[in-house]
Amino acid sequence: MADRRRRRRRASQDSEGEEEEEESGSDSVGSGGESGAPVRQERSEQGNRKAEPPREGKESECESEDGIEGDAVLSDYESADESEIVPTKEVEEAHYNEEEPLKATLKQENNVEEAPAARDQKPKSKGTVTGERQSGDGQESNEPEEDKTIQKSQKQLDDDEDRKNPAYIPRKGLFFEHDLRGHVNDEEVRPKGRHPRKLWKDEGRWVHDRFHEDEQAPKSREELISIYGYDIRSSKNPEEIRPRRPRKPRFSSPSRREENNEKASWPLNRYQDSGDAQPLRPYTNRSAPPSNKVVPSRTYSRQGGYKENRASYQSEEEASLHTYERRQVYGGHRARSSEQGPPPPREFSPEADPIVKEEAVIEKQAAEPSPPPPDRPVEKKSYSRARRSRIKVGDTGKSMEDTTAAELPPPPLMPPAVAAEFTPAPLNVKQGNWEPPAEGGMSGIDEELSQMNLTEQSWNQGQPAYISPRGIPNPMHMGNGPPQYSRMEGMAVQGGRVKRYSSQRQRPVPDPAAMHISLMESHYYDPLQFQGPIYTHGDSSSSMPPQGMIVPPEMHLSHPGMHPHPSPATMSTPNLYPAPVSLPPGQQPPQQLLPPPYFPAPPNVMNFGNPTYPYPPGALPPPPAHLYPNAQAQSQVYGGVTYYNPVQQQVQPKPSPPRRTSQPVTIKPPPPEENRHLKMNEKINS
């Protein structure tokens, strides 16, 4: 501030001197006007001389303000504000440099043209002085005119231009040259002539650098066509561009494949729609007949598609062959699909393979002896009937199965119908798969069961026990695997239908079986508690070994008087029948021979639980010695009945109770919260 005061004093002194000179000049001009022109000229020259020295002095001061002599001037005054004054002067210089050259040129023109007119020149000089002072601080003088110019200059200084203002924006220097804030014209900010400058030299350029400046210009249409074959910028003719796109064939080809897949899958879809076996079943059956392979049904994949209305327990070979033929019968498309070759079985689970192999051996044997041709026509009819009215299917299936059963070699081949019905393949693939002629097959199954009970006791003990009796879904024959109830709901529906064959069922099975059925109705034991052997009493008792016997539902479910009583423990579904225990009248409860096997019986299978009371050993026939040669054997099929080793199966229920107990463990934490709620309620009530 001290500098500014000093400068103001100096400026005020200069301006006062100037004004005095101007006044004297004006007086001389006025006096000379009365005398002659020569005096006027002399005085004007004198006035010029007098006016010039102060103007020169003034210019020198302005120059010092512009920075030529300013450093020296400022260096004379060492003050705290010096650092601030210099940048403000720089900012103001930046703003008013352009005005000063214009003013200088105007001054020269004025000097050349109006030198003779002293009157004009003096005000000009004054104007130039005031204009030049605008480039300074704007505080050069205390005169009212100077004050006006100061106000103007202060108005022109924006907040961002006044360095004392915190909003000041520095615009000088390379760092700020691109700062566009507050600038209307880019030209003011960006240096001119910058763009053409090259940022690198071509001399040290890498050889593989493909960038050429001359190639950066937009290409002409001819060049584009020569390079790309068409004008890539023209969107007017998309047809011309399309053939060059490689995408189009890609789009079309997958669609064709999809169409082919759809065509191939049509027969399967119709098969589903017709309500017949689910699509996977045809696949497994198709593959089965030619290759005689049992589709691995042991993978207990519950694929939700149990078709409840149909219980088909055909032997695998029969079922597969007949389904194969039925497909052909049922429309050209189906025949076509079957001719194309059996599709690979869909669900092939590695776990099932060992079992499948054994079954495959058995069923190959079964397939050879059974002559399919005589059965096929009957089966076709039954198949169509099954589609329309499922109830009648059983009859045709029965006749077919009877013929096949008689022809099959008794021991390993549970009559092919039995093998097929339990062939895990249909079960495995979809547990509704063994559905085709279900009811009809059951009567045939009954007859076959009787034959098997009587004739097939000479069965090879070495045969794997995986061939299950007919009415029992395959999962039952896996000794360890809990049976998958593929058809529980279906059995509930079919309970009434199956009863139609109760008379047939009782033909093969001697009266004791019927008696035991009637007893079953009255005695129901919780299978979890009493799962034990049930023994048929009477002629067939010898053929039916005691241990953990599962009686196919044809034996018992179809009994007209029987109604399922839900046993809470095993009834995973309401259609599951608890294990009834049949006791001959007058006998005290027989003693339990083996620990009760635990496997909830599928609806088709009656699991007869062991009563907790002991069986008298004499009351029941001893179990055949060959039945349990190995305690570890999973299951044995004897006389068409699958026997499970209760020793092994008793282990199965053990894991599940721990699971149940473990669930409460997870539930245990909440009780404190309940206590809290109780406490809160008590507090609220109180």
Curated annotation (Swiss-Prot):
SMART domains cross-referenced by the UniProt entry: Btz (SM01044)
Main localization, broad class: cytoplasm
Pfam families for the chain: Btz
Matching InterPro entries: Btz_dom, CASC3
Gene Ontology MF terms: mRNA binding
Residue spans of biased composition, Basic residues class: 1-10
Subcellular location(s) per record: Cytoplasm; Cytoplasm, Perinuclear region; Nucleus; Nucleus speckle
Region (Disordered): 1-419, 646-686
Subunit record text: Identified in the spliceosome C complex. Component of the mRNA splicing-dependent exon junction complex (EJC), which contains at least casc3, eif4a3, magoh, nxf1 and rbm8a. Forms homooligomers.
Function recorded in the entry: Required for pre-mRNA splicing as component of the spliceosome. Core component of the splicing-dependent multiprotein exon junction complex (EJC) deposited at splice junctions on mRNAs. The EJC is a dynamic structure consisting of core proteins and several peripheral nuclear and cytoplasmic associated factors that join the complex only transiently either during EJC assembly or during subsequent mRNA metabolism.
Protein name: Protein CASC3
Organism of derivation: Xenopus laevis
Lineage: Eukaryota, Metazoa, Chordata, Craniata, Vertebrata
